[in-house]
Swiss-Prot record:
Chain span(s) of sequence motif BH3: 74-88
Transmembrane regions listed in the UniProt entry: 188-205
GO molecular function annotation: BH domain binding; channel activity; heat shock protein binding; identical protein binding; metal ion binding; porin activity; protein heterodimerization activity; protein homodimerization activity
High-level lineage: Eukaryota, Metazoa, Chordata, Craniata, Vertebrata
Residues that, per the record, bind Zn(2+): D160, H164
Protein name according to UniProt: Bcl-2 homologous antagonist/killer
Subunit structure: Homodimer. Formation of the homodimer is zinc-dependent. Forms heterodimers with BCL2 and BCL2L1 isoform Bcl-X(L). Forms heterooligomers with BAX. Interacts with BCL2A1. Interacts with RTL10/BOP. Interacts with VDAC1. Interacts with GIMAP3/IAN4 and GIMAP5/IAN5. (Microbial infection) Interacts with vaccinia virus protein F1.
Record keywords, A-Z: Acetylation, Apoptosis, Host-virus interaction, Membrane, Metal-binding, Mitochondrion, Mitochondrion outer membrane, Transmembrane, Transmembrane helix, Zinc
Motif (BH2): 169-184
Stated role: Plays a role in the mitochondrial apoptotic process. Upon arrival of cell death signals, promotes mitochondrial outer membrane (MOM) permeabilization by oligomerizing to form pores within the MOM. This releases apoptogenic factors into the cytosol, including cytochrome c, promoting the activation of caspase 9 which in turn processes and activates the effector caspases.
Chain positions of motif BH1: 117-136
Keyword Membrane attached: yes
């Protein structure tokens, strides 16, 4: 992925330079595979848990994956963490989407506004996981409301947002996406979950539903 300015919002100044071991651009490139893997395993988890109550999205079911790749494993690990986030806060994701009623025309605007609010007070792994979770929910919501083939666009939303809002740089400074493989242990995970989704029922709803 080119490092120059492309479509989307101007890139923010991100402070410290990225570590040479995992460049910002490499993280942005890896994000696509991480998100695809995350989506596949999250969708699989819901299918197994809910059965016919959770209609399958054919695009998610047939995603091309490399399960043994490092980025594939990262996506799976984040899906496990995301499953915990979803169990605790799914009703707030659903309420948000029902109120906003995203379409192909306005989905990028809504995604960007909500994602920007998520990281307004800083970046941490919990918020990164919540961002992937919201991208998944957005893609599934749009599919369930009659628009097929939208997952690729949501993937691009996630990649572009991470690159233009310093998140790819932040991940690179921590060694790249591979660092996420060490997140799933007890107290650390609980802290990340709380920090990652605390705004969903408060800040986002207040800003977008009451404006």
């Amino acid at each position: 992925m080119a490092s120059g300015q492309g479509p989307g919002p101007p890139r923010q100044e991100c402070g410290e330079p990225a570590l040479p071991s995992a460049s910002e651009e490499q993280v942005a490139q890896d994000t696509e595979e991480v998100f695809r893997s995350y989506v596949f395993y999250r969708h699989q988890q819901e299918q197994e848990a809910e059965g016919v109550a959770a209609p399958a999205d054919p695009e998610m079911v047939t995603l091309p994956l490399q399960p043994s790749s490092t980025m594939g494993q990262v996506g799976r690990q984040l899906a496990i963490i995301g499953d915990d986030i979803n169990r605790r806060y799914d009703s707030e994701f659903q309420t948000m989407l029902q109120h906003l009623q995203p379409t192909a025309e306005n989905a990028y605007e809504y995604f960007t506004k909500i994602a920007t609010s998520l990281f307004e007070s800083g970046i941490n792994w919990g918020r990164v996981v919540a961002l992937l979770g919201f991208g998944y929910r957005l893609a599934l919501h749009v599919y369930q409301h009659g628009l097929t083939g939208f997952l690729g666009q949501v993937t691009r939303f996630v990649v572009d947002f991470m690159l233009h809002h310093c998140i790819a740089r932040w991940i690179a400074q921590r060694g790249g996406w591979v660092a996420a493989l060490n997140l799933g242990n007890g107290p650390i995970l609980n802290v990340l979950v709380v920090l990652g989704v605390v705004l969903l029922g408060q800040f986002v709803v207040r800003r977008f539903f009451k404006s």
